[in-house]
């Protein structure tokens, strides 16, 4: 008799950590075409030279795709570390827009819903948490304080100046 057990086992493919390769592998909507040259250049620079630096600033004009760049960088970090990553917007409106972008490009994400509990997919480093600054920085933060706080591997502040003003 033939044993097909070895053939039927799922083989885990290595996770891509290059954000450009991640983008090319995403199940994105047809209206989402290839990366723009400026996006590709920034992602190449980050991946090849700045990936291990603690603080990075990416500056682009409105509408040039900063949200997508940030989400791809966080997905790269998740694929590499399996650790929690968070995308923080200055307000709820921009957080909802970032969610739409994640859906459009097929990037796995989660949000803090009405239950106000931190999603398990975020804590386990499976999905990017998209939220707004007021969810993190308030007297009743769900992220905890001091020794009871949640450790986050990577944080992207969308429009950091506006986020800082809100804090």
Name these PLM-found stretches.
Residues 1-167:
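N-terminal helicase ATP-binding lobe
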């Amino acid at each position: 008799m033939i044993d097909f057990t070895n053939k039927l086992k799922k083989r885990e493919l290595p996770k891509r950590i290059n954000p450009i390769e991640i983008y090319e592998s995403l199940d994105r909507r047809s209206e989402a075409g290839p990366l723009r040259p400026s996006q590709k250049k920034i992602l190449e620079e980050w991946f090849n030279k700045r990936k291990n630096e603690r603080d990075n600033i990416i500056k682009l004009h409105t509408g040039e795709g900063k949200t997508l760049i940030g989400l791809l960088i966080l997905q790269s970090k998740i694929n590499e570390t399996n650790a929690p990553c968070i995308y923080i917007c200055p307000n709820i409106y921009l957080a909802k827009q970032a969610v739409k972008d994640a859906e459009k490009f097929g990037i796995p994400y989660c949000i803090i819903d009405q239950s106000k509990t931190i999603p398990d997919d975020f804590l386990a480093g499976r999905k990017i948490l998209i939220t707004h600054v007021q969810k993190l920085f308030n007297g009743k933060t769900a992220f905890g304080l001091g020794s009871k706080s949640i450790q986050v591997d990577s944080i992207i502040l969308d429009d950091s100046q506006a986020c800082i003003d809100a804090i």
